[in-house]
Regions:
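Sec-dependent bacterial lipoprotein signal peptides
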Residues: 1-20
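A general secondary-structure boundary signal
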Residues: 10, 20-21, 80-84, 114
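Membrane-proximal, proline-rich intrinsically disordered regions
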Residues: 22-71
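Generic structural "secondary-structure junction" signal
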Residues: 26-29, 34, 40, 89-94, ...
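Secretory-pathway/luminal and periplasmic proteins that interact with or process carbohydrate-rich
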Residues: 56-62, 76, 153-164
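Primarily recognizes Gram-negative and organellar outer-membrane beta-barrels
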Residues: 71-73, 133
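Conserved, well-structured interaction surfaces
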Residues: 82-161
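Short, flexible helix-coil linker/hinge segments at the edges of structured domains or between repeats
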Residues: 167-179
């Protein structure tokens, strides 16, 4: 009985050491390492698809309803449970879950776009990236789409969270190209 107990303890110790000695410093199986993400035309196409997937989530639900509530397009009724009351009154804070979700998801989208734009900028720096002229032109189109997506996200955030423009209190832009 004592020998069986010792054998069990030794076997359990060996098994534990065997399991914990595995190499766990690996990238997740469903992710591409950052340095390998944008090195082929396929990588750019997949990143572009990731940017476009943003539109699925950011063009429906609370994202569409919030500005309508802020613009008084919807008015509260007796049984609306004050779900968007803070937005309706323009008294919302960053702790409001709707505001936090909209803010964080748009900035996550901007982060994806910035990663893509940075990757396009590094094409010429990386001698391992070999692209045909047609592929370079296609990536330039994708880059333009990325800039549009970033502008869309900033526009939406400004529409929801910025004050109205007031000429009287606006800063004077000196040496501005756009007059």
């Amino acid at each position: 009985m004592v020998n069986m107990k010792k054998i069990s303890i030794i076997a359990l110790t060996i098994l534990t050491l065997g399991v914990t000695s595995c190499d766990m410093d690996k990238m997740p199986y469903d992710a591409v390492p950052t340095e390998e993400a944008l090195t082929t035309i396929v990588g750019f196409e997949e990143a572009r698809a990731g940017i476009y997937s943003v539109y699925l989530g950011l063009t429906g639900g609370s994202y569409v309803l919030a500005p309508e509530v802020q613009a008084d397009a919807f008015n509260a009724v007796a049984d609306f449970s004050n779900k968007y009351g803070e937005l309706h009154r323009w008294t919302f804070e960053s702790t409001n879950s709707t505001v936090e979700t909209i803010w964080s998801n748009y900035y996550a989208a901007i982060g994806r776009v910035n990663f893509f734009i940075d990757g396009v900028g590094k094409i010429d720096e990386n001698p391992e990236i070999e692209l045909t002229e047609t592929q370079r032109q296609q990536i330039n189109v994708y880059e333009g789409e990325a800039y549009f997506t970033r502008a869309y996200c900033y526009f939406y955030l400004a529409t929801l969270f910025c004050r109205d423009y007031d000429v009287a209190t606006a800063a004077v832009l000196r040496d501005c190209r756009f007059r």
